[in-house]
Amino acid sequence: MLVLISVSTVAVIATFPVSQKDEAKLAAQSLFQRIQLINEEAILSGRDFGLRVDDLNRAFLFVELSEDGWKKLEKRQFGSELQLPSELVIDFQLGGNAWVKDERMFDPEPLFDQEMFAEKKQLPPPQVYILSSGEVTPFVVSIHPKQSPTESWRIVVEENGQIRLFAPGEQDEKA
């Protein structure tokens, strides 16, 4: 049933001629539903998934952990890539203090040239992990039109795994 809902959502989103504000809303709703669907799939199937966010190219890529490393999610019913129109902007922020890079004691760069021994190119690891245990990396994604950053739709994934969608102007009750 969840597959039917996600497929119908993607089909509906693709057929509407909409304004920039509506495009931001539809893109945020589509991403929100995909994250929820992948989270449920991870728990039910016992597999681990991830999400790569490319805010410069306005793209989201869902990946799956296999024996060979991270690979693009190949599901016929589920679009593994979400490309936003050029009129929209993505603001992506990982949650939690563990992801702050400014106060690291050591440089995260490898000591050795890993390219020398590399066998084949793999996808880089995702920024967001969606694990079979129900854990999800906390993050916030804001999607808004270029001309109106105040019309921002936010997807908030909290440390407890709760996934929420906020409309422009809507505030978190905890804040």
State what each model feature region is.
Residues 1-13:
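Alpha-helical hydrophobic helix detector
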Residues 10-17, 26-30, 40, 48, ...:
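N-terminal helix-rich module
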